[in-house]
């Protein structure tokens, strides 16, 4: 009889011990974070404001603290009932790792730098379009083309035939008046130095071959406005020497339709000096 009572007592104790363990397991409230490196779990028997940090990476002994994690969470109430096994999403603790965030930022910076380097390298080594217009040498109509067209015109071509030269290029003349220092010299006389002007430039000339009257039209840069001055030189002797000098004021291109052209005579020597 005593043996039966002892067996019943042992069975009753075992049943109560298993039921207590199951209720303790059900009473625990677990909260997991969305981070794969760890989660937080709140124990019912640990107090009101204590959080148990469980490291899921190594599954070592749990420790209480914050570690290297930044936590923004709302603590659960310790007086929660055992009937609520499922927890709503609003009570879950969101956890992020500062180290993982730093690694992600460094990876993003590295990707941005690689993209920028590749873009700059493409800009440097990109093929530039070949511009054929810049390589071609532009040939302007010169004297040869003008002469050939002129010969065609003079050999029986119609009167309205146009030549290849441009009027701006054909009629381009340059006749300038340049100042210089002129020396008047004579034998047994002192040298006289005066300030005068000379004519320098490019004018149009025209020669028509195979013509009976041999008409030539030439234009020369000649004085268009001048004065004649008589200069008396200081000489050693009884004879007085007077020189007639053309004092040039303006120059222009003048055409002559003769076989010869008139040139102006200047009393100049090798020591003549031009002034710019």
From Swiss-Prot:
GO cellular component: extracellular region
Single Gene Ontology MF annotation: Wnt-protein binding
Lineage: Eukaryota, Metazoa, Chordata, Craniata, Vertebrata
This protein's name: Cerberus
Keyword annotations of the record: Developmental protein, Differentiation, Disulfide bond, Glycoprotein, Neurogenesis, Secreted, Signal, Wnt signaling pathway
Disulfide bond sites: 175-221, 189-235, 199-251, 203-253
Subcellular location(s) of the protein: Secreted
Organism, as annotated: Xenopus tropicalis (Western clawed frog)
Segments forming domain CTCK: 175-259
Gene3D superfamilies in UniProt: Cystine-knot cytokines
Tissue: Expressed in the anterior endomesoderm of the early gastrula with expression expanded laterally around the margin at the endoderm/mesoderm boundary.
Gene: cer1
Function: Inhibits wnt, nodal/nr-1 and bmp signaling in the embryo to promote head formation and anterior neural induction. Within the endoderm, acts as an essential mediator of nodal/nr-1-induced cardiogenesis in the overlying mesoderm.
Known partners and oligomeric status: The long chain interacts with nodal/nr-1, bmp4 and wnt8, thereby inhibiting their function. The short chain interacts with nodal/nr-1 but not bmp4 or wnt8.
């Amino acid at each position: 009889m005593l043996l039966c009572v002892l067996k019943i007592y042992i069975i009753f104790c075992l049943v109560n011990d298993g039921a207590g363990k199951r209720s303790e397991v059900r009473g625990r409230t677990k909260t997991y974070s969305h981070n794969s490196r760890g989660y937080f779990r709140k124990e019912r028997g640990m107090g009101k404001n204590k959080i148990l940090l469980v490291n899921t990476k190594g599954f070592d002994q749990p420790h209480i603290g914050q570690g290297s994690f930044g936590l923004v969470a709302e603590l659960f109430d310790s007086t929660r009932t055992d009937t609520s096994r499922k927890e709503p999403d609003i009570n879950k603790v969101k956890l992020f790792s500062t180290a993982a965030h730093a690694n992600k930022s460094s990876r993003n910076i590295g990707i941005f730098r690689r993209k920028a380097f590749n873009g700059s390298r493409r800009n440097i080594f990109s093929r530039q379009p070949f511009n054929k217009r810049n390589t071609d040498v532009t040939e302007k109509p010169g004297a040869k083309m003008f002469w050939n067209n002129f010969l065609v015109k003079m050999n029986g071509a119609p009167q309205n035939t146009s030549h290849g030269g441009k009027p701006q290029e054909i009629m381009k003349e340059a006749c300038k008046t340049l100042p210089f220092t002129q020396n008047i010299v004579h034998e047994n006389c002192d040298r006289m130095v005066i300030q005068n002007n000379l004519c320098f430039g490019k004018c149009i000339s025209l020669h028509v071959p195979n013509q009976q009257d041999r008409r030539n039209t030439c234009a020369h840069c000649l004085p268009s406005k001048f004065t004649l001055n008589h200069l008396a030189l200081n000489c050693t002797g009884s004879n007085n020497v007077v020189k007639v000098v053309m004092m040039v004021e303006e120059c222009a291109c003048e055409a002559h339709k003769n076989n010869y052209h008139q040139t102006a005579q200047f009393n100049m020597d090798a020591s003549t000096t031009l002034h710019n």
